[in-house]
């Protein structure tokens, strides 16, 4: 693949670091990859957008799923994952996940993560939506992500890995042959490095997390603006399955006008026996699915949305009053505190909940070793699309995917280094085409962020149709056209900065999401088309893949099968440009 030539308008790098590998992101995927690369003797640099312990991992409540319990097997975990994925999982990718997962969790424990234990002394395992067995290991009751983050951050600091915090990655650097040569980044604030710089490395691992901030209401932190997906698109990489955005069924409802990050009410609350009820106290999941409240997330989110439509309501309720105070305080202290902070006491009253954007099942298309279609560029965690999640991620498979595929990436880079194919001398990067005072590509103003979020929530949220998606595409195109006209006709664009770079990245990923959702004319997993209400395996048991063209149009195509072929050296299909 060749780069699009599109870059974020930014000053020229004023400093540079050399490394063997640069890992972008400090969640479970990024720090696991970094620790394994460092252990293999690779000079490793970690770049992260905020502090090392920020990002989505620390917000994960439920836990990490793996076949660790008595009587459970990887095959059973595989079956549950395939069912949740609604016919679009790559079975080989899932088999890797479930067979390598248990040992990956054990290595995480050896790194220093402390999981809750049962009274018998083994791991305390709970059950969540879509799982037929108790196989979710958790920590601190409902603070699993925070504990995993703590353990990994401590390990990174103990080993003295070089880290660059408060740094927004801008673009991929490549050499004349199109090989990865590092990244450009902007460090916020003053420190050892500040302003725009570069990390030169022959291998780049994207572990930048999700893009939930493309919607008005999300469980994702404010830093989740799709930076990794946007960078990969500009670098010429393929993105797959971006239409499959998982809306978590039970997010604390803070009012119809609430925007930004909102508190998650973990699946594990339902796993322990909480009931979904309407305003009349009627349970509405019984009879809709054999697992009732523990059905896969897409089914529960749709059921809540339908009930809201039927009742003209903007939320439903999660009733766990029967847990009692002691269970709430010991098993779900984080959720209890979040509810009480907003004036709700789940011990004595039902909790108002509604679906909100939670997880991108799609992302940068990779093979089984995390390799993208750009040589030397890897991706893992939520930013990646490995084929594991299909059309809908199974609860608590995300942390496991981050662990397993990060280790596979590190092994692949280490093997290339040992074989001498990871070129020892960092190639000289090509001159950045957008460093001049006269940028070629516009930046959106900061206020465009809210506009994009509202466009996406209205047109590409839980419920979608050809009309809603067409309106969203037109409005997104209008934002870009307005910025492009201001630049080309008047020589004006927004000043380079974190707010304008984030808004521009959000527009990039929003356009791709809408294009993919419009192309998939069926309902499957967490993609719900009102105008195509049925699942169509004959036509649509395949992936929607998108590339960014140099003229900023989108090349959209579908694969022939649900399986993921090798990404780096495969034959390229013919693409049909599509202006969005």
UniProtKB/Swiss-Prot annotation:
Tell me which GO cellular component terms the UniProt record holds.
cytoplasm
Where is coiled-coil annotated?
none
In its UniProt record, a GO molecular function of this protein is:
L-aspartate oxidase activity
Q: What does this protein do?
A: Catalyzes the oxidation of L-aspartate to iminoaspartate, the first step in the de novo biosynthesis of NAD(+).
Q: Some GO term, biological process aspect, for this entry: which one?
A: 'de novo' NAD biosynthetic process from L-aspartate
Entry EC number(s)? 1.4.3.16
Classify the main location.
Answer: cytoplasm
**Which residue ranges are recorded for the region named Disordered?**
556-580
Q: Could you tell me where this protein is found in the cell?
A: Cytoplasm
Active site per UniProt = 297 (proton donor/acceptor)
Reactions catalysed, as given in the entry: L-aspartate + O2 = iminosuccinate + H2O2
UniProt protein name: L-aspartate oxidase
State whether keyword Cytoplasm applies.
Answer: yes
Q: Where does FAD bind?
A: 26-29, 49, 56-63, 227, 382, 398-399
Q: Which cofactor does it need?
A: FAD
Question: Which top class of enzyme applies to this chain?
Answer: oxidoreductase
Superkingdom is: Bacteria
Key words, A-Z: Cytoplasm, FAD, Flavoprotein, Nucleotide-binding, Oxidoreductase, Pyridine nucleotide biosynthesis
Q: Does the keyword Ribosomal protein apply?
A: no
Question: Upper lineage ranks?
Answer: Bacteria, Bacillati, Actinomycetota, Actinomycetes, Kitasatosporales
Q: Which family does it belong to?
A: Belongs to the FAD-dependent oxidoreductase 2 family. NadB subfamily.
Which positions does the site annotation Important in orienting the L-aspartate substrate cover? 128
Q: How is the cofactor bound?
A: Binds 1 FAD per subunit.
Q: In which pathway does it act?
A: Cofactor biosynthesis; NAD(+) biosynthesis; iminoaspartate from L-aspartate (oxidase route): step 1/1
